Amino acid sequence: MTPSALVRATLAPRADGGAVGIALLVVRVASGLFFMFTGIGKFVTFQGEVDHFAEFGIPWPTVMVVLSGLLEAVGGLCLVLGLLVRPVAIALAVNMAIAIATAGREVGGPFHLGVAPALLVLMLLLAWSGGTAWSLDRRLLSREEAA
């Protein structure tokens, strides 16, 4: 696969415009904002998050809080902008699967066994669909195709 074909495969949306495109835009922006706020929150309440990660049995809790917080904050921003939607959605889906397997198992509750699984499904949807017409991915793809 050529680099150009790889870029097209990564950025090309599966649904553009119409009601489906608008629905995917809402899902992408809303989940992106949610991830941005939870990622920033991990740094605002840093020591508490480290303590929770340690309780959940996550190795290297300090490092993992930083990595998870950065992934959620930066990944959320990327989703809002529609930048690298597929790889970011896959990374966030893995993050949610880990949250379900660790905090969900230890704590349960409406977030870890309600919101996290819903976000996992939404990230899988975005990994499948891509950024749609209203995304930076689409603009980058248009430039790539024009070149």
Regions found by a protein language model. Give the residues of each.
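Extended, low-polarity transmembrane helix blocks
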Residues: M1-V44, V63-L70, V74, L81-A147
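Membrane-interface interhelical connector segments
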Residues: V7-R8, V44-W60
